[in-house]
Amino acid sequence: NKLLGNDLNAAGIELTMRGGTYRFRTTASFCITGADMQATLDGESVPMYTVISASPMQELKFKTAAKGMRTYLLVKGGIDVPKIMGSSSTFCDGKFGGHNGRALRTGDVLHLAEDCQADNFNSFDGKYIPKIDNTWTIGVLPGPQPTYEYLKPEYLDTLTSSEYTVNFNSARTGIRLNGPVPQWVREEGGEAGLHPSNI
């Protein structure tokens, strides 16, 4: 949004894993950030973190993300969707927000702000472009419960030294990891979510 001179809270499109195809019905300035999905505009490669001008009927196509997971398509002025609780985001599980409270479908028409052409093209310092990879180091903090009453100390060492993969059942509300199974101090009882006593 900053690159386009938009309000920082202007609505855009978040693309997860794969991007789809979008046709402009008016002249509009846009930019793409996040994971590189090898976008093309009428077959011509579109650079990331660069303001591009699209003409009516031009087609913007995305492939899939080779590294990273989410790509962001922003348009000058933002996408015209209602704000709910101060946010333009879509909450698919709750069926509200964004465009009709759901993921985009073929044939959907998104309305842009009246002024959707950038007057001047801001530059973006390359040092601020995040390095996106498929392997990440994440931090771990103990929760409010007394950790050592639930988990064996040796498992905590395993937890912080192992590699995990993201489970396909993950979503915005929570990430499930595949990796070493917790080693519990007690065989039954307790309140931890994954504990064998919890059904």
Name what the model sees in each region.
Residues 1-199:
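Conserved "landmark" site that anchors the functional core of diverse proteins
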